[in-house]
Amino acid sequence: MEANAYSRLWFETFLRTQSPEWTAREVAFVARQAPQPAYRTVLDVCCGEGRHAIPLAERGYDVTGLDRDGAALFAARERAADLGVAARFVEGDMRDLAASVAGPFDVCVCLWQSFGYFDAATNEDILRQMGDLLRPGGRLILDIYHPGFYAAHQGERTVERNGRAITISERLNANHLTVDIDYGPDAAPDRMEWELYTPGAIQTIAARHGLRTVLACTLCDETQLPTPDMIRMQLVFERML
């Protein structure tokens, strides 16, 4: 099966069952780390159906969302139109950002573990491209998995979403995470793969490309340092002058 294909069933099962309260927390974190009016233009890389892009636009940001999934972008445009929100949604490949969007932006966000899909060199180049699309002093905000969490939490588990029992198998090999999702006999499975980065590793990569670390935290809480006890961490970088 193709990894990281994100089936329609995946969107229905995981994206659309995300807590509105958690989405609001993520968006509020972005707004604190990139406050208006100093930061206004936002590029949301791997925006999906606009879960973050639309509420950021509702806050007054000038938002461009980029994703490779045309169906997800169609849903994002429909939802934005229904809400009367002005946001642009562009189809494109995160490996070649300049082919689809033109900077500079004040902010680039890549949230909900949407970074690390490729090999180490390609991932680093994507981070470089995101930084290059920022104005001097612009900020890049990443929300990514902590490899230490998965080092201690591998194996198989069953969850229930939308009345469906789903088996999730998670395996970490070095820093490569593979997640297999079995929806049952009536649906094709999904596979997700990522390269994961420790806080220090991703900060070192960012520094190589002129991005200084402003903040590393977890739970979208500036007072909480990243820890292997928590699945996610947020990092804020600033493009140096």
Mark where each language-model region is.
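A short glycine-rich, Lys/Arg-flanked "PGG" loop and its adjoining helix->strand segment in the class I
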Residues: E124-P136
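C-terminal lobe and adjacent flexible extensions of AdoMet/dcAdoMet transferase-like proteins
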Residues: A201, I205-L241
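Class I SAM-dependent methyltransferase SAM/SAH-binding core
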Residues: A53-D96
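A short acidic, Gly/Pro-enriched loop at the edge of an enzyme's catalytic core
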Residues: A99-V107
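Conserved class I S-adenosyl-L-methionine
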Residues: M1-P37, Y39-C46
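SAM-dependent methyltransferase
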Residues: A121, G137, I141-I205
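Conserved SAM/SAH-binding loop
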Residues: E49
